[in-house]
């Protein structure tokens, strides 16, 4: 009888110990909102106002919490984004703000982006809090060529004086597209538009995609199109 009681006590002890151990390591399904909310946890509101005098429109995108209060989305880096579009529906300016309406620096880099369009070309400028063109790490402006479908083909980098500058070891990039319209190849370019090794050690980055366009593989080539390695271990 004593042995049976002893075995029962041991069994109960092990069961309780196991239960406590499971509870101790069980992941907390609750979210720590002390650091803020992600965009997926917030309501997204979109409002568009027409400006008949300027033949343009302003679309305001706002993140709201359950109390319908404007709220910072920690994964986006802003609470409010405003987009200015021209009569053709092309975005010509984008700015970012906090919940109080103050300009914010996106990615600790820039406060807004300005787009200027020409025939098969777009000029992209990065803006400071006052709406002036500002320099990033190396460049302040991208001159982008577009194909007939409006897709980005070539990007070239320039400073505030519109002088060509290097970024990641190149002066620009060229994009190729497959039959489905997916970008399947990026070539890094020197000042003369020829392939050059980027700072990662390759000149061409090829993408393998599935039917839905998801990247399933990457390949690195040198300036002659021969396989090579990435210096960053990709």
Map each language-model feature to its residues:
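N-terminal Sec-pathway targeting helices
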Residues: 2-15
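Hydrophobic alpha-helical membrane-insertion segments, chiefly the h-region
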Residues: 15-26
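Buried hydrophobic residues that stabilize the cores of well-folded domains
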Residues: 26-234
């Amino acid at each position: 009888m004593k042995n049976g009681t002893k075995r029962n006590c041991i069994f109960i002890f092990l069961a309780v110990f196991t239960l406590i151990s499971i509870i101790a390591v069980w992941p907390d399904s609750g979210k720590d909102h002390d650091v803020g909310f992600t965009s997926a946890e917030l309501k997204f509101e979109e409002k568009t106002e027409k400006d008949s005098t300027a033949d343009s429109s302003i679309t305001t995108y706002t993140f709201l919490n359950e109390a319908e209060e404007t709220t910072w989305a920690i994964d986006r880096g802003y609470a409010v984004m405003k987009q200015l579009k021209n009569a053709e529906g092309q975005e010509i300016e984008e700015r970012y703000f906090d919940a109080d309406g103050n300009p914010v620096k996106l990615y600790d880099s820039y406060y807004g982006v300005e787009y200027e369009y020409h025939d098969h070309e777009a000029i992209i400028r990065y803006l400071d809090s006052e709406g002036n063109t500002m320099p990033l790490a190396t460049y302040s402006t991208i001159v982008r060529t577009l194909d007939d479908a409006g897709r980005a083909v070539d990007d070239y980098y320039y400073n505030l004086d519109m002088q060509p500058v290097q970024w990641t070891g190149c002066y620009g990039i060229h994009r190729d597209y497959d039959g489905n319209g997916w970008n399947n190849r990026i070539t890094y370019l020197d000042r003369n538009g020829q392939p050059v090794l980027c700072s990662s050690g390759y000149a061409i980055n090829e993408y393998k995609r599935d039917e839905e366009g998801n990247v399933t593989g990457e390949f690195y080539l040198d300036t002659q199109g021969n396989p090579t390695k990435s210096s960053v271990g990709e």
